[in-house]
């Protein structure tokens, strides 16, 4: 009895000593433990999602893929699968499970290694939220204490919901919602019992038991989970047998992107990072943009097709690679497929390998293991590329172009496969709502995988004749009218700085003598623009451009400004054209309409400053009177004083060129009124003439009339020296769009496809705005305006219509007449008399070439 008594005393002492040691250890560790109360308000790391204006997902950013689900959204079978596998006594313990610890220790003692885990679900939750993954005794002790605290703070359902949303399940999937989507492309409530068991088996070793990594191990682990569920009574024998017999159909499923707009999505990502830092990728923000699927896809298609058309005009540069030569042993299909899978795709272009070729047909293997046929029709364009200005002869048979063993690029055209190549030229498109500044579509290049440089907002390119509408607006604000006569004859003036004559020329070099300003813009006459520039003064013109939002540092103060030597981005150009389309208001482009937090609360909503030509909003600049430039007198030349030429327009502080393109919260405000509404209408009307011309002459943008078949549009071509840049910008009802095309390498020009008498069927022609950029504008605008009722140009108050003589710009006295618009008070008062001289802007050059 004494022995038993001593044994009991010893046991009590050991228990007290153990309890005291545990308490002392707890008091020592307690200051190091995190506050588990934060779990009450925990915010799981949820990726940022970017949506279109109509709610379609277009991008997702974040290292962790998580789709939060509530416990009542998770099927009971999935919950039971995790409990049976990870913590069968979950509802019985209080954070740590002594029975589980004893069982795991016994197995380890007798087997010689730890084959069973002793961590409860609550301990795993503590580790996932608060501790590092290091395997140390101190971490296990902290984990146990934290688990006890968590059980005191949260009920079992709250613990389960946090755990099932937090646990890492492989392939960047965190939580059961993300795992269901990643592996099976389903929501959790759509999973079969077998699929639930696969996911429940992953926490132990997400990489080892991953069905995308090892199907055999995934099946074995699934069967273990099903066995545990059966032994715990969660499923019947019949359910077990059926689930165990099912094959696992798992594939990687990326986020379900409805459509892609990568350049604009990247702009959103950058804006969100600038605002919120790294938390932008983790706090579950949902960003709604201003674009829609139809419009954005039309823009991307228009740009890609136009770039490919340009590239084909200039010839075939040959295969991307030669994998084996004719006569050598061909590669087997697996080696070909593996090689192709490692290559990217660029828009519609797919990598392929020619596996056979004869004069009539070639067969090419694709990355998915299928083969396609290429015929002469799909490679007739492939003249050998010699330079940007010359191509070789038209191929006559398939083997003139491709040979077996070549790695090429192909694309589908209608139901046929065509030979293709990755273009070296690039392009951008920006489309805005001119009333609000909302970005309707944005394309920053041919393909984001090819180049992430966003040419729509980052590429400063010379604008060429795209600048002329702005400069003519400045000239008309200082006294010229659409009927003013300017001398279309060559100019030659000594340039002391260059030590030679400066001789701006028309393109093509054709001259018509005195013509009206409307025709000068419509036919893009360079020398006419130079004369108007000289009439108003270079400094005045340069300062005036800032009204349209163009940054001063990119504007040159020389006469070459008249020919478009200033450099702007497509976004800046589109914004400038919006002023002419909306009645004279400088809108701020924006692309984010709304931001929601992870709970669906709106934390930002755009309140753009809108254009309102019907509102009584004064112009923020003083208007220059007509008398400052022209008196209505019959003189052959008009002299303008040097003081008048260089007088600058007072400029209030405008936005920086590279503004953050996101509208701010606040009450409704109106955009700055920078040119008066009647003046904006005049230049808008002139841009319409650039497309439709007049009897006797065509505008440079005439193709838009043919392609769109509507009269409520206007636009302007733009081409720089040596065709390094080509533009087309213009408007339609509710939309303004600018398209640029060129090479990123400023040393290269778009060139011309030079004709050769020795080569038949050679394409030849000048690569300028109308040929190189306008096709994309036309295709895009046709798609966007489909179904939009035509809206005729209606003169605003302050505009009068006068019948003028086409040859003189004076009041009509015969049949050669047209109706012309004037700001009230600027219309001509004299009848046209052809025998007497007319007021002509000629600038008094001392050297005339004819």
What do these predicted regions represent?
Residues 91-101, 174-177, 236-239, 453, ...:
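Short, well-structured active-site flanking segments
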Residues 82-83, 229, 299, 359, ...:
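Active-site SXXK
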Residues 1-51, 89, 108-109:
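N-terminal type II signal-anchor transmembrane helix
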Residues 500-506, 537-575:
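Mid-domain, small-residue-enriched loop/turn segments at the edges of structured enzyme/sensor domains
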Residues 110-135, 186-189, 256-259, 435, ...:
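Conserved catalytic neighborhood of penicillin-recognizing serine enzymes
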Residues 22, 27, 111-367, 532, ...:
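Non-catalytic, structured segments within soluble enzyme domains
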Residues 78, 289, 293-296, 300-302, ...:
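A penicillin-recognizing enzyme superfamily signal
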Residues 67-72, 389-399, 422-427, 450-470, ...:
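Short active-site loop at a secondary-structure junction
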């Amino acid at each position: 009895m004494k022995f038993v008594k001593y044994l009991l005393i010893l046991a009590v002492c050991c228990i007290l000593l153990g309890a005291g040691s545990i308490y002392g250890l707890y008091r020592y560790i307690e200051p190091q433990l995190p506050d588990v109360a934060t779990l009450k308000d925990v915010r799981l790391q949820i990726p940022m999602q970017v949506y279109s204006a109509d709610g379609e997902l277009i991008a997702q950013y974040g290292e962790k893929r998580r789709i939060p689900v509530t416990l009542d959204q998770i099927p009971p079978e999935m919950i039971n699968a995790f409990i049976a596998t990870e913590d069968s006594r979950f509802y019985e313990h209080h954070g740590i499970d002594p029975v589980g610890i004893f069982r795991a220790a016994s197995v380890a003692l007798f087997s010689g290694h730890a084959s069973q885990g002793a961590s409860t679900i609550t301990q795993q939750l503590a580790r996932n939220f608060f501790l590092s993954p290091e395997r140390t005794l101190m971490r296990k002790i902290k984990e146990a204490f934290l688990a006890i605290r968590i059980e005191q703070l949260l009920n079992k359902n709250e613990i389960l919901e946090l755990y099932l949303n937090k646990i890492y399940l492989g392939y960047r999937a965190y939580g059961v919602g993300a795992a269901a989507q990643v592996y099976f492309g389903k929501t959790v409530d759509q999973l079969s019992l077998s699929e639930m068991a696969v996911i429940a088996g992953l926490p132990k070793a997400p990489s080892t038991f991953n069905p995308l990594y090892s199907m055999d191990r995934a099946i074995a682990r699934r069967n273990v989970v099903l066995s545990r569920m059966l032994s715990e009574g969660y499923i019947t024998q019949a359910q077990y047998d059926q689930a165990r017999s099912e094959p696992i159909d798992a594939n990687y499923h990326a986020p379900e992107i409805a459509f892609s707009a990568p350049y604009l999505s990247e702009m959103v990502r950058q804006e969100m990072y600038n605002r919120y830092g790294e938390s932008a990728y983790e706090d579950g923000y949902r960003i709604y943009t201003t674009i829609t699927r139809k419009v954005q896809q039309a823009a991307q298609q228009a740009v890609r097709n136009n770039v490919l058309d340009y590239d084909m005009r200039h010839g075939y540069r040959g295969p991307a690679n030669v994998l084996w030569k004719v006569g050598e042993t061909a590669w087997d299909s697996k080696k070909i497929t593996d090689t192709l899978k490692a290559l990217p795709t660029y828009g519609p272009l797919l990598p392929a390998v020619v596996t056979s070729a004869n004069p009539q047909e070639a067969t090419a293997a694709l990355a998915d293991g299928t083969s396609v046929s290429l015929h002469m029709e799909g490679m007739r364009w492939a003249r050998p590329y010699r330079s940007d200005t010359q191509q070789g002869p038209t191929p006559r048979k398939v083997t003139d172009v491709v040979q077996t063993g070549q790695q090429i690029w192909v694309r589908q055209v209608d139901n046929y496969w065509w030979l293709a190549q990755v273009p070296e030229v690039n392009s951008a498109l920006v489309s805005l709502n001119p009333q609000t500044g909302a970005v309707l579509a944005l394309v920053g290049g041919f393909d984001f995988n090819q180049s992430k440089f966003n040419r729509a907002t980052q590429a400063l390119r010379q604008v060429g004749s795209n600048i002329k509408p702005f400069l003519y607006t400045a000239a008309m604000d200082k006294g010229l009218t659409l009927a003013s006569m300017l001398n279309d004859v060559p100019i030659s003036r000594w340039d002391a700085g260059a030590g030679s004559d400066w001789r701006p020329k028309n393109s093509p070099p054709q001259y018509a003598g005195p013509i009206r300003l409307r025709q000068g813009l419509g036919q893009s006459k360079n020398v006419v623009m130079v004369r108007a520039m000289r009439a108003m003064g270079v400094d005045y013109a340069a300062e005036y451009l800032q009204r349209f939002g163009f940054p001063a540092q990119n504007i040159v103060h020389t006469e070459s400004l008249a020919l478009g030597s200033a450099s702007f981005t497509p976004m800046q150009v589109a914004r400038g054209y919006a002023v002419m389309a909306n009645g004279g208001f400088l809108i701020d482009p924006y692309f984010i309409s709304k931001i929601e937090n992870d709970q669906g609360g709106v934390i930002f909503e755009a309140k753009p400053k809108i254009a309102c030509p019907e509102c009584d909003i004064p112009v923020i600049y003083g208007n220059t009177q007509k008398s400052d430039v022209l008196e209505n007198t019959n003189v052959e030349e008009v002299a303008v004083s040097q003081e008048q030429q260089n007088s600058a327009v007072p400029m209030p502080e405008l936005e920086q060129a590279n503004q953050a393109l996101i509208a701010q919260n606040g009450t409704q405000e109106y955009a700055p009124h920078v040119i008066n509404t009647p003046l904006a209408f005049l230049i808008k009307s002139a841009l319409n003439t650039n497309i439709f011309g007049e009897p006797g002459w065509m505008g440079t943008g005439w193709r838009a009339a043919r392609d769109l078949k509507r009269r409520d549009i206007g636009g302007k071509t733009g081409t720089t020296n040596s065709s390094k840049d080509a533009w087309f910008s213009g408007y339609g009802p509710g939309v303004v769009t600018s398209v640029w095309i060129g090479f990123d390498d400023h040393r290269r020009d778009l060139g011309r496809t030079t004709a050769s008498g020795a080569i038949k069927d050679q394409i030849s022609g000048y690569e300028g705005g109308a040929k190189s950029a306008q096709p994309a504008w036309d295709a895009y605008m046709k798609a966007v305006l489909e179904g939009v009722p035509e809206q005729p140009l209606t003169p605003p108050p302050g505009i009068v219509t006068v019948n003028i003589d086409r040859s003189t710009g004076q009041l009509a006295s015969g049949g050669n007449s047209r109706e012309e618009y004037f700001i009230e008070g600027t219309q001509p008062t004299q009848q046209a008399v052809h025998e007497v001289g007319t007021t002509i802007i000629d600038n008094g050059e001392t050297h005339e070439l004819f």
